[in-house]
C-alpha cells in the first residue's frame, strides 16, 4: 500500500516538472524566428546591409521624384514665364485702352466741332444770295442810291461771314487759278486750253466752304485741261464705258 502511494507521488512530481518546462518562456531568438515564419517575412539579421541598401534606394527614388516635381529652379522659371506673359497681356490691354480713350476723345471733339454742319450748310446758301444781290447791284450801276445799297449789303454779308468764321470755323476757300483737286473741286465742265500744262480751275461757278478742316461743300468749277491730257481722259472714259457695256 505504501509503495503504491510513493509511485503515485513520483508520477505527480514528474508531471509537474514537465508542465513547468512547458510553461517556461522560450528563447527570444526562437520567438522571433517563429514570428517571422508565421507572418511570412524574411528576417533581416542575416543580410542587414542588403536591407539598408534597399531602403536607401527606395527613399532615394522618392527623393528624386520629389525633386523633379518641386524643384525650386523650375518653379521659379515657371513663375517668371507666367509673370512675363501677364506683363505682356497687361501692356497690350493698356495700349488698347489708351488707343480707345484717344479715339473716344477725338470722336467726341469731332461731334462737337461738326454738330452744326447742316445748319451752316444752309447758311452758306444765304451767303450765295448775298453774293447774287451784290452782283446784281453792281451791274445796274449809275445812281448813288444803288451804290449805297450795295455797300450796305456788302457790310451785312462781311459781318455774317466774320461771325460764322470766328464762332464756328466756317471759311471760304478760293478756287480760280488753283490746280484742280477732286477733294476740293467738283468739275462741271472741262475745256481744252493750250495755255495750261496741267488741269487748272478756269472759272468758279459756285463757292466752296470748309468747316474747320472738313469740306462741307465742294466748289463747282470749270476746268482748263491741256490737249493731251484731255484726250487721255476721254480715252479712259470711253474704255470704262466699253467695259461696262461688255459686262
Curated annotation (Swiss-Prot):
Q: What is its main location?
A: cytoplasm
Record-linked SUPFAM superfamilies: Coiled-coil domain of nucleotide exchange factor GrpE, Head domain of nucleotide exchange factor GrpE
Alphabetical list of Gene3D superfamilies matching this protein: 3.90.20.20, Head domain of nucleotide exchange factor GrpE (2.30.22.10)
Q: Cellular component GO terms, alphabetically?
A: cytoplasm
For this protein, the parts annotated as crossing the membrane are none
Keywords in alphabetical order, please. Answer: Chaperone, Cytoplasm, Stress response
Annotated region Disordered: the residues are 1-68, 226-247
Q: Name one Pfam family in it.
A: GrpE
Q: Which InterPro entries match?
A: GrpE, GrpE_coiled_coil, GrpE_head
Q: Which domain of life is it from?
A: Bacteria
Subcellular location as annotated: Cytoplasm
BP GO annotations? protein folding
Biased composition annotated in UniProt, kind: Basic and acidic residues: 7-35, 43-54, 228-247
Q: Which GO terms describe its molecular function?
A: adenyl-nucleotide exchange factor activity; protein homodimerization activity; protein-folding chaperone binding; unfolded protein binding
Function as written in the Swiss-Prot or TrEMBL entry: Participates actively in the response to hyperosmotic and heat shock by preventing the aggregation of stress-denatured proteins, in association with DnaK and GrpE. It is the nucleotide exchange factor for DnaK and may function as a thermosensor. Unfolded proteins bind initially to DnaJ; upon interaction with the DnaJ-bound protein, DnaK hydrolyzes its bound ATP, resulting in the formation of a stable complex. GrpE releases ADP from DnaK; ATP binding to DnaK triggers the release of the substrate protein, thus completing the reaction cycle.
* Family from the record: Belongs to the GrpE family.
**Quaternary structure annotation from Swiss-Prot or TrEMBL:** Homodimer.
Q: Can you say what this protein is called?
A: Protein GrpE
Q: State the organism named in the record.
A: Treponema denticola (strain ATCC 35405 / DSM 14222 / CIP 103919 / JCM 8153 / KCTC 15104)
Amino acid at each position: 500500500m505504501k509503495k503504491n502511494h510513493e509511485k503515485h507521488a513520483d508520477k505527480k512530481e514528474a508531471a509537474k516538472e514537465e508542465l513547468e518546462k512547458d510553461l517556461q518562456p522560450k528563447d527570444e531568438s526562437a520567438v522571433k524566428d517563429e514570428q517571422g515564419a508565421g507572418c511570412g517575412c524574411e528576417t533581416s539579421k542575416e543580410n542587414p546591409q542588403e536591407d539598408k541598401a534597399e531602403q536607401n534606394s527606395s527613399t532615394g527614388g522618392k527623393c528624386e521624384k520629389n525633386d523633379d516635381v518641386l524643384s525650386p529652379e523650375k518653379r521659379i522659371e515657371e513663375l517668371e514665364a507666367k509673370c512675363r506673359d501677364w506683363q505682356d497681356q497687361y501692356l497690350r490691354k493698356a495700349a488698347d485702352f489708351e488707343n480707345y480713350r484717344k479715339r473716344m476723345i477725338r470722336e467726341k471733339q469731332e461731334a462737337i466741332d461738326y454738330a452744326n454742319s447742316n445748319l451752316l450748310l444752309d447758311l452758306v446758301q444765304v451767303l450765295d444770295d448775298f453774293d447774287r444781290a451784290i452782283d446784281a447791284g453792281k451791274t445796274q450801276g449809275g445812281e448813288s442810291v444803288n451804290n449805297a445799297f450795295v455797300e450796305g449789303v456788302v457790310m451785312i454779308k462781311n459781318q455774317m461771314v466774320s461771325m460764322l468764321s470766328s464762332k464756328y470755323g466756317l471759311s471760304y476757300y478760293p478756287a480760280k487759278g488753283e490746280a484742280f483737286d477732286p477733294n476740293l473741286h467738283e468739275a462741271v465742265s472741262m475745256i481744252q486750253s493750250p495755255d495750261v500744262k496741267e488741269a487748272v480751275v478756269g472759272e468758279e461757278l459756285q463757292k466752296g466752304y470748309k468747316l474747320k478742316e472738313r469740306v462741307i461743300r465742294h466748289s463747282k468749277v470749270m476746268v482748263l485741261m491741256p490737249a493731251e491730257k484731255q484726250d487721255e481722259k476721254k480715252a479712259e472714259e470711253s474704255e470704262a464705258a466699253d467695259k461696262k457695256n461688255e459686262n
